[in-house]
Amino acid sequence: IGLSLHYLEISKAEARRRQEMSRDLELVRERNRVLGFISKYDELTGLLNLRGFTEQTKKFCSSEINQRAYIICGDLDHLKEINDTWGHPAGNFALQSVARILGGCLRSQDTLARVGGDEFLILLNCEEENFQDIFRKRIKDACTVFNAESDKPFLVEISLGIAEFRPKPDTDTQEIIALADKELYEAKKHRRKSVRRPES
């Protein structure tokens, strides 16, 4: 009986040890999941960050081979003016609003990321003719609707640069982003001089 009790105590101790190990492993897994999320997502907007966007782009170029695709650079106009005039909470609100506006104009399979202070990237495929003109108008109209409903003293407006490409596994997406960014730079020359809401 004494020997049986001894083995019973060992079995109980072993069961407790295994339960603790299982709990510890689950905590490690959860921590890794959280760290993985943080490493790929932007905290302010909940969108992918540059690392997450780069990973999605690699997968996209390996699966959507030779389809007509686009990388779009979107930029919140006059973020510095918003921050300097109304404070950083207003700037954060404007950035979150851009995320919602852009997201509302995209499909569920499209990729949207915030990759810098005021810069966003979009990756999508579309065979629609005149896509670039259609998309620019869609974003402009969405901003118009947003600003009409907003009670903020500033306007939220977005400049766009769009680059078309045919994805392949060896596509240099940094080169495509650079082309879109160059067009964005030209587009920003034509933005309004201030985002201060006109007095009625």
Give the role of each language-model region:
Residues 3-43, 51-61, 111-113:
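Signal-transducing coiled-coil linker helices
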Residues 6, 84, 123-127, 165-166:
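Residue-level recognition of strand-loop junctions within catalytic nucleotide-signaling folds
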Residues 36, 40, 49-70, 77-107, ...:
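Conserved long alpha-helical elements within nucleotide-processing catalytic cores of c-di-GMP signaling
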Residues 71, 120, 158-162:
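A structural signal for short, well-ordered beta-strand segments
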Residues 84, 88, 133, 165-200:
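Catalytic-core segments of nucleotide cyclases and related cyclic-nucleotide turnover enzymes
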Residues 104-109, 140-153, 186:
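Short catalytic/binding micro-motifs of nucleotide second-messenger systems
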Residues 114, 143-159, 192-197:
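Catalytic core regions of nucleotide second-messenger enzymes
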